[in-house]
Each structure stands twice: as structure tokens, then as C-alpha cells.
Amino acid sequence: MLEVMIAAPASGSGKTSVTCGLLQALKDRGLAPAAFKCGPDYIDPMFHRSVLQVPSRNLDVFLAGEERVRELYRRHTAGCGAAVCEGVMGFYDGMTFGGDRASAWDVARLLELPVLLVLHPYGSSLTLAAQVKGMLSFRKDSRIRGL
């Protein structure tokens, strides 16, 4: 099964647009994708649902715990050809200032998902390369596999 998390350095970077476009492309190819959103957000899953015509599930490590998130992911990907999980906020931004618990990275680590990083290059050029380099090396296994 094809699996990917769509994440970004910050909110407002285009994660939801990329996620919905990817879900539609996978659906058009007959892969029956499952859609997920990190955290308790209910707005972005409504956009996912409008593309797929099936529910998008929330994966919230803070509220549900790691084992429940694993179980929900396994249950709702059974029989699917692909799974797309949209990250939350900035990739490493967790529930507390300076912490990464319940961040998109935390969920990607937990579920062993490869990460596609969405970048919003407005007003920058070489600085974007420095930002990506920092994100790749910030954690031993960033799980970032593409931009």
C-alpha cells in the first residue's frame, strides 16, 4: 500500500491543497485511498471528505494515545490501496511550546510513514535550502523523503 504524510514547516503552506489533490489523483487511479489528519482538527477532514466522499479520520496522539492511533490507522487502511495523512501546524510542532509530542513528526514516526514536505517559497530562495537542511537534520530520522 502506498502511504505518505503531507507536512510543512508551518500552517498556511498548502498542506490541505496538496493533500486533496493527491487524494483525488489516487482516487482517479482506482487506488481507494484512506484519508487522515493529525490532531483533533475537523475542518481539513471536511475538505478530504469532499474529495473522497468517505470520512477522513483524525489521528490524535494527545487525546487517543499511541496504541489507539496505531489501531485506528490499521483499521481504516485495511483494504485500501493508499493512505494519505495530512500533518498539523509545523512538522515538529507539538502540544507544548518546544515539544514535539503529538506533532506531525510524532505521528509519522509512530506509523512509520514517509513524509512529503510542502514548502511555500514566497519571498525566499537560498534561505529555503537552509530551512530544509535544518528540518532534515533536526531529528535523527526526520522521515522526510521528498519535497
Task: List each model region and its residues.
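ATP-dependent carboxylate-amine ligase catalytic core
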Residues: 2-13, 17, 23-111, 119-143
